[in-house]
Amino acid sequence: MSTLNQGDKAPEFTSKDQNGNAISLAQFKGKKVVLYFYPKDSTPGCTAEACDFRDNYQDLKAQGIEVLGVSIDDEKSHQKFITKYDLPFTLLADTDKSIVEAYGVWGEKSMYGKKYMGTNRTTFIIDEEGNIAHILTKVDTKAPTAQVLALIK
């Protein structure tokens, strides 16, 4: 689990988005950022989470909130995911695991009694100054936007 705490400076990163463009956290200084980590493109829980952010994206933008999704999937996978579900926000391809490791969300998981390494679904809300305002570890994949907005208000 994350070793970061509320109030900590959010770790800086630069990564490729779904189109191969370099995106850094510093680009969003002055805005609130919902940085959400998810295990895998096009899986049921991850799709529900992304679609909820999609469905509420205009409300988030109207409040000055940027949404960035992060998984270890590559750019091509992200492009398919975005196209299939009409996602309006940026997905970062953390193929070298540098962001998931910096944020402490890469770790051991268990499914059907088997242990494996993977991304623990976690959402960070980063304030306008680049500090971690909130960390959400118990994400409701069907209503993550409501969880985020409840914390921000």
Model-predicted regions and their roles:
Residues 1-153:
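Chalcogenol-based redox active-site neighborhoods
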